[in-house]
């Protein structure tokens, strides 16, 4: 087997190489290959840039949305904390009001009971005094009746009893 040089005119690979160089040379001279090749590359680059721009825009929108959601969550947490504090304050206020009302009601009932006790004591004292007056009047009547017997005694006893009853009441 004989080895032929690549640059030999009898070598078919030389002619394929030459045809290929001439073909690409014509394409470059006629500006077919660079325009088509660079146009395709430019179109692909523009498409990639548009996708990157869109991705960047979507990322910025997502970050803005995330920040908005975080702000809303923080606001909701603040509102919930404020509502909880208000509820605690209301519960404390209502408990204090209920305690005050209960104390006032107990005080009123105690005062009412004291008034009833005072009235009962006054009534009992009046009843005892009236009974003592009646008993003293009966005893005096009996004693005077025994000492003064006769017509003159009856008039004196009646006058004394009348005066005693008026003075005691």
Curated annotation (Swiss-Prot):
Keywords: ATP synthesis, Cell inner membrane, Cell membrane, CF(0), Hydrogen ion transport, Ion transport, Membrane, Transmembrane, Transmembrane helix, Transport
InterPro entries: ATP_synth_b/b'su_bac/chlpt (IPR002146), ATP_synthase_B_chain (IPR050059)
Functional summary from the UniProt entry: F(1)F(0) ATP synthase produces ATP from ADP in the presence of a proton or sodium gradient. F-type ATPases consist of two structural domains, F(1) containing the extramembraneous catalytic core and F(0) containing the membrane proton channel, linked together by a central stalk and a peripheral stalk. During catalysis, ATP synthesis in the catalytic domain of F(1) is coupled via a rotary mechanism of the central stalk subunits to proton translocation. Component of the F(0) channel, it forms part of the peripheral stalk, linking F(1) to F(0).
Family: Belongs to the ATPase B chain family.
Keyword Transmembrane helix: yes
UniProt key word rRNA-binding: no
Organism: Caulobacter vibrioides (strain ATCC 19089 / CIP 103742 / CB 15)
Name of the featured protein: ATP synthase subunit b
Source organism, top-level taxon: Bacteria
The protein's assembly and partners: F-type ATPases have 2 components, F(1) - the catalytic core - and F(0) - the membrane proton channel. F(1) has five subunits: alpha(3), beta(3), gamma(1), delta(1), epsilon(1). F(0) has three main subunits: a(1), b(2) and c(10-14). The alpha and beta chains form an alternating ring which encloses part of the gamma chain. F(1) is attached to F(0) by a central stalk formed by the gamma and epsilon chains, while a peripheral stalk is formed by the delta and b chains.
């Amino acid at each position: 087997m004989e080895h032929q040089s690549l640059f030999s005119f009898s070598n078919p690979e030389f002619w394929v190489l030459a045809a290929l160089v001439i073909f690409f040379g014509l394409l470059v001279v006629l500006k077919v290959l660079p325009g088509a090749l660079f146009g395709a590359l430019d179109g692909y680059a523009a498409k990639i840039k548009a996708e990157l721009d869109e991705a960047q825009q979507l990322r910025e929108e997502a970050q803005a949305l995330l920040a908005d959601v975080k702000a809303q969550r923080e606001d909701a947490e603040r509102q919930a904390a404020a509502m909880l504090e208000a509820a605690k304050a209301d519960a404390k206020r209502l408990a204090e009001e209920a305690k005050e009302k209960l104390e006032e009601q107990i005080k009123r009932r105690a005062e009412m009971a004291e008034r009833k006790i005072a009235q009962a004591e006054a009534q009992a004292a009046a009843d005892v005094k009236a009974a003592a007056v009646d008993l003293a009047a009966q005893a005096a009547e009996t004693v005077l009746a025994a000492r003064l017997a006769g017509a003159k005694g009856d008039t004196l006893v009646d006058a004394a009893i009348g005066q005693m009853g008026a003075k005691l009441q």
